[in-house]
UniProtKB/Swiss-Prot annotation:
The active site is at R19, N37. The gene is acyP. Residues 4-91 form the Acylphosphatase-like domain. This is Acylphosphatase. Belongs to the acylphosphatase family.
Length: 96
């Protein structure tokens, strides 16, 4: 079963290479989508892939890389679209 989630990560998640490590984890789990920093200090991401792999990436985000401190993780399931063929780091607020 395919799955899509929209994720917001709160805590010490900027300046600790959270986006780069999320991309590496997504590639390892064969999950597509994107990740970006938000001006309010959170990290936002969209993950698409097979349900077990997306769930594994969500679990990874609960901990994050070694220097991150994840205080809260919001996960919202969305309708799977299959629109992504890779996993990207976005560097502005446009997710298109």
């Amino acid at each position: 079963m395919m799955k899509r989630v929209h994720v917001y990560v709160k805590g010490k998640v900027q300046g600790v290479f959270f986006r780069a490590h999320t991309r590496k984890a997504a590639l390892r789990f064969h999950v597509n989508g994107w990740v970006r920093n938000l001006p309010n200090g959170r990290v936002e991401a969209v993950f698409e892939g097979r349900s077990p792999e997306v769930n594994a990436l969500i679990d990874w985000c609960r901990q994050g890389p070694s220097h991150a401190i994840v205080e809260h993780l919001d996960v919202c399931e969305e309708t799977y679209t299959g629109e992504f063929d890779d996993f990207r780091i976005l560097y502005d607020e446009r997710a298109s």
